[in-house]
Amino acid sequence: MGTAQVLPGILQKHCCILPDRNTESQCTLCGEPEEEEGGDLAQPGLSFPGPAEEDIDQQYSWSPTQHFSEERYSPAPRNMKGLTGSRNQPQLCVGHTCGLSPTDECEHPHDHVRHGPDVRQPYLLSPAESCPMDHHRCSPRSSVHSECMMMPVMLGDHVSSSTFPRMHYSSHYDTRDDCATSHASTKVNRIPANLLDQFEKQLPLHRDGFHTLQYHRASAATEQRNESPGRIRHLVHSVQKLFTKSHSLEGSSKSNINGTKSEGRMDDHHQSHLSKHSKRSKSKERKPESKHKSGMSSWWSSDDNLDSDSTYRTPSVAHRHHMDHIPHCYPEALQSPFGDLSLKTSKSNSDVKCSACEGLALTPDTRYMKRSSWSTLTVSQAKEAYRKSSLNLDKPLVHPEIKPSLQPCHYLQVPQDDWGAYPTGGKEEEIPCRRMRSGSYIKAMGDEESGESDSSPKTSPTVALRPEPLLKSIIQRPLGDHQTQSYLQAATEVPVGHSLDPSVNYNSPKFRSRNQSYMRAVSTLSQASCVSQMSEAEVNGQFESVCESVFSEVESQAMDALDLPGCFRTRSHSYLRAIQAGYSQDDECIPVMTPSNMTSTIRSTAAVSYTNYKKTPPPVPPRTTSKPLISVTAQSSTESTQDAYQDSRAQRMSPWPQDSRGGLYNSMDSLDSNKAMNLALESAAAQRHAADTQSSSTRSIDKAVLVSKAEELLKSRCSSIGVQDSEFPDHQPYPRSDVETATDSDTESRGLREYHSVGVQVEDEKRHGRFKRSNSVTAAVQADLELEGFPGHVSMEDKGLQFGSSFQRHSEPSTPTQYGALRTVRTQGLFSYREDYRTQVDTSTLPPPDPWLEPSLDTVETGRMSPCRRDGSWFLKLLHTETKKMEGWCKEMEREAEENDLSEEILGKIRSAVGSAQLLMSQKFQQFYWLCQQNMDPSAMPRPTSQDLAGYWDMLQLSVEDVSMKFDELHQLKLNDWKIMESPERKEERKIPPPIPKKPPKGKFPITREKSLDLPDRQRQEARRRLMAAKRAASFRQNSATERADSIEIYIPEAQTRL
């Protein structure tokens, strides 16, 4: 307890919180042993019912009561060597955190929790003893949690008296006051009696004390972690700035909250602030400013709250140390009581906390639920959604061991699994202390500084750090556990970490402490992702809905729970979102890594690569390249942020290149088909080698395979399924043309078969990637959902997939070459003309598509059959036919011009017709070809609909009609031996139109005007009208789609900020 010793006075003042921030010792709940144990966090923190502890406990077991006196607390130096009685007393309060002012109450609850006869032991031991198996975890969480479960009231008081000032609720307010007084005395061991009186009078002081304590604790923990207060201070300052921004936005609402909370805490806060300010100064945290700013509002001053979780948590740290547990269980619940400081809050706190600890839905208190509930409710809702989506969160989770804790995570009972679910081991203690650390950004930062994976991501400055620490922690864990934990932790970050492992918990607690409710909601979503990894397709769509519902609910609940730190949440959400995006990136990468371990890891973001990465992990770097594509994912905000972090993440995740590249980058890559294709091309080259080594061995057998691979690569690229894409990229990009024609049918079939084996997976993965995107509210949601329903078979069916996984992937390519390569091969060379319509257009090319379709049909019959429908594939066939026809006309006319000595007038007509046809094919046909490709690419953004294609086709028909008229005229001349038989007037008319037709689209209009009497003209007029109507409709749809995409893109960043 060097820290405790270093900060004895502070520790005394702040009793259990600071003492063992470093330790797993649960100074918060049982914190005494922590000091006793010399920072032995594990058991000491739990403060097993040793005689001394019992004596102290007995001595202070009633400490929650008003009987606590400053002297009394001070005599108990035993809690923490530095704290002396201070820590113990607060812990006694914690012990009596049950909120039972009477010793008996505390004792009984503690006995209940502790399962020990001695209530005083329970006080210290109760947290530890209440969950003996939870000793490490139990101590802080167990104490609160156990007490919470054992004695909701006790929990309230426990929170109140111990580190959970915010958990102190009116119901136990008296006790809490006493407790606070005791606490204050304890904290105020170095505080004058008058301050003690004020503390006693004002519960807020406790919070401030705890708050300060938390900062101090963070500092101490930081120091223990060899982190300088200055560094922590810097981190805190950074976080404060971030939070200040959100706070400025949320300040008003927070002010109200603070008003409520600060009223009761104003004096305490000032006093605590005074005493804590030095400590805060000691930790150099922005909190002192907050406290100064909001003397009374300090607890919940918007600035305090928003400036730092540490403020939010720091005041809470005592409460946070417990509240870390409780907030972990009910981060918001604690807050809400603080906002209310009323009996109802206290009651609700106890009830909710107990329920949360017990894994209840946190239904007890609306506010409690609102705070904890916006996470909790969203979590439970998410779980319900997951269940509905047959995610079977419990089942999908990789490990049964994880499942129990995961459920709590889902239920936002992370505290439960943290406190109750893992009452075993010093990790509980560690986690609580860590959580305390994580409780404040300083702590989180400090943890980051210390290289704690939990805290690293917490601090925005160290957000980048988190991935590595997280990876470290994940890597440190067993691979299976690691994949689950890393994934779960990544997905559910805190909750999963908690549920996964106390160890993991300590990682997640930071997140939890930062914005536990938010983190839980996000974690729940992440867990949904984890679960979705379990059932990829199924989860993705449902995960998307869950994400929407959870995020929306979380947001709404967060707003409802704004009495808690709604502002904090908002700020925390934006900041945490960014952080989570940062660590989530890592987590996603890790989950993606985990997916490598578990193919079913379909984490929305990482899902895409789960199959591919297995096959071709190497492409990760290319994925990293493509990751910039679009950061729109199911966890849109997180993934978007992740996209921002993906480079670093990918680098960090390079150890896990298989998963990270495939999973994390895919969705974003898929989102931006153009970028994805460009990146895909780039990564195709990069991945070519890795993919070639992997898939080349199997697919580089022939060009056809290469072509299919290339197509798949493009498709995968587009869909950001780099693995298989990588396989194909090496071969695909260039052999595409020649291979296309030659190997279209044979190669296509083989490639298709291979592709189906691999390509379908790619598509599935792509779907999953899209799901991520769709989760982030992308237009791909429909396609994703469709694909989701049908992992491989239907996946192709899904529009792009229908046209073959390659089509789906192909549509993404934004580069003509890619399209030509992909589409030509995949499109059966039908649109080879893309690159060179005339050269590409070839019956040989066209037939291959059929064989290719057939193979596709084998894997994705509906997908291959889909071309029969009026979709991109169908229109591509039409376009191909039209192109071939037009090319034939051009060749014929050119041949006629060469073979015959034609007049300049006729030659002009031929040149006009041929030029118009070539221009039409090279421009409008090409455009339409790309539209068809995009239509077939479910990941295309925006993705043209079949109606759009139909409208554009109608438009093309006008141009085609004009060109056809020219060739008809030439044909008539040819039949007439190239003699112009028409009357001068007619000739005039005909002469005029040819020049006009040179203007491809415009020529038709003049012709129409000139030949308004001709039947073709009337038909053209009608066609033009239809075209204009279709064009307007298509334009509207396209604009709407674009707007949707924009709004989505905008929305996602917003979600990133808000969620």
From Swiss-Prot:
High-level lineage: Eukaryota, Metazoa, Chordata, Craniata, Vertebrata
Residue positions, PTM Phosphoserine: S302, S308, S390, S456, S667, S670, S673, S720, S745, S776, S811, S983, S1012
Protein's membrane topology: Peripheral membrane protein
One Pfam family this sequence matches: GKAP
An annotated GO cellular component: postsynaptic membrane
Biased composition (Basic residues): 272-285
Taxonomic source organism: Rattus norvegicus (Rat)
InterPro entries for this protein: SAPAP
Sites of Phosphothreonine modification: T743
Name by which UniProt lists this protein: Disks large-associated protein 2
Region ranges (Disordered): 31-56, 244-311, 446-466, 632-669, 723-756, 985-1024
UniProt keyword list: Cell membrane, Membrane, Phosphoprotein, Synapse
Role description: May play a role in the molecular organization of synapses and neuronal cell signaling. Could be an adapter protein linking ion channel to the subsynaptic cytoskeleton. May induce enrichment of PSD-95/SAP90 at the plasma membrane.
Any GO molecular function: guanylate kinase activity
Tissue: Expressed in various brain areas.
UniProt record similarity statement: Belongs to the SAPAP family.
Biased composition (Polar residues): 244-261, 632-645
Presence of keyword Metal-binding: no
One of the GO biological process terms: modulation of chemical synaptic transmission
